[in-house]
Amino acid sequence: MSARLSFAALAFAVASCAYVEATTTQYVGVPKFPPTKAAAVQVLPGEPKQRHDRLGEVLLDISVDPAPPVADIEERLREEGAKMGANAVYVIRDAIRPGEGRKLIGIAIRFRQ
């Protein structure tokens, strides 16, 4: 009986886990940069005024119930932006749609010197 209870508890825990899944798209015709450190990538609420180049998009598929902490979402944006060589990622869309869940789109950018 305790094995069944343990299995049921494990199944519940797995089913109730929050998730942040990412898909990235690098833009065509944009120079490729070496990866940066995720900790150095800024997450911005909108497009910055500083001169920059757009490297690509980061699409996050985020669980709604339970929702992950905001820090986990921002960390995933940093990680994916860093893979493209970005200095920052700014959010262009963050929406929850019935039946689709939460979708967030960010643009990975590299500031010009």
Spell out what each predicted region is.
Residues 1-17:
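Sec-dependent bacterial lipoprotein signal peptides
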Residues 2, 85-87, 111-112:
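Short helix C-cap/helix-to-loop transition motifs enriched in small/turn-promoting residues
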Residues 15-33:
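Bacterial Sec signal peptide processing site at the extreme N-terminus
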Residues 35-69:
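Post-signal-peptide N-terminal segment of Sec-exported extracytoplasmic proteins
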Residues 39, 54-56, 85-88, 100-107:
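Envelope-exposed proteins and targeting segments
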Residues 49, 67, 96-113:
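Short acidic, glycine/proline-enriched helix-loop-strand junctions
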Residues 55-93:
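Short, well-ordered alpha-helical segments
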